[in-house]
Amino acid sequence: MLSRRAILAAGAAGLTASLAALPTLAAARKGFVKVEDGRLSLDGKPYRFVGANLWYGAWLGAPAAFGDHARLTRELDKLKSLGVTNLRVLGAGERSPAKVAMDPTFRGPGEDYDQTLLTGLDVLLAEMAKRGMKAVIYVNNFWDWSGGMPAYLNWTGNGTWFQQGDPAHPWPAFADYSARFYADEKANALFRHYVKTLVGRTSTVTGKPYRDDPTIMAWQLANEPRPAGSEEFGKANRPAYDAWIDGTARFIKSIDANHLVSSGSEGDMGCLGSEACVVESHKTPAIDYLTLHVWPNNWSWISMTDQPSTYEAGAARSRDYIRRHIALAKSMGKPLTIEEFGLIRDGRAFAPGSPVTFRDRFYRMVFDEVEADMKAGGPTAGVNFWAWNGEGRAQHADAWFKKGDRSYVGDPPQEEQGLFGVFDADASTLAIIRDHAKAVKAI
């Protein structure tokens, strides 16, 4: 098992000193989002935002045949026109045997990182800066659509490769496999080398070190890191999981003392269904704020095949989930962002402009909860809907992603292209987002 000493790696004394110095350093830097009195702030004022997930931003920004700088600027302009000022983006991607995954990726098992994609991230951040946007950059993934933790395990030979959704290895086999990552010292050494390179990077576009760029709001450890899929393995793996969150967050802060760090957790649905799990794994001062994801379809709270008869109960359960985690954030004295939420289209359609009756109701409900907590002076700083498809479109009649596709959308490769994402043709949803942005600005 990976020891706490191995995870911290850089030396406890140096990391502790770096962490202790963070508030002073961050406070002196204009334009950086920080934490004050359990809430996010920017230059002495509350930082509130309406955000979106644009995981593929670096791919669009890349100066290569697979990139599309012109589309990137159009998408950012459209998002800005809606009042979106915060984007959650992917800053990593690992080559893997996954049947459906992103290609190209930021890296393989060696240290020859893809400079074209890294330049794409430089371009994305520079374009966001022009529009006054902030970025949350996640640097790993629990799921295999970008390679993620399973790819690292595959490189180090830790067990047989498990494909997410493989009927030969039903749930929770994949999640238990991916969660082995936290205790794998070799896998984490590879991961930390990439993190050190990325966080310590200097932009090829602006010439500014990432650590000095206020466009970045936060570094995020991973997309939806879970301690396990099964309760049995989860209990055994919790010490490694908790130590990995604390150690990785401290490692990032030892490189960059100016930016916030978050975990990317879903909340207790991604922590063995336990609020205590969330508290224990996030009580470290190296984690600056809590994150929450709300997925009623994926969690079987609202049926994908019968939304009309299951929506009310599922929406009520989602509302309670949000409120419980707001209360949890208050009790911990930490800010909260609802950085993923979504609902499928009516009848599980995928086409742009197809009816989104229940999705629109769900968006309004989430936005109402956020606005209410903001008005009450609560810990909620903002939301990032999942996800922005914009002018991207499915390239195949069955709406499934195929290797080599370049019309990127927010729905990742393992899902139908259009399942949860918001297209530029979804007029009713765009209006709801725009109205929410106006309401947040008025608070």
Predicted regions: what is each one?
Residues 1, 19-30:
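C-terminal segment of N-terminal export signals and the immediately downstream linker at the start
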Residues 1-14:
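N-terminal secretory signal peptides and thylakoid transit peptides that target proteins
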Residues 14-22, 268, 343:
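Hydrophobic alpha-helical segments of integral membrane proteins
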Residues 32-302, 310-335, 341-368, 373-436, ...:
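Active-site mouth of glycoside hydrolases
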Residues 306:
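Acidic-aromatic pocket-rim loops
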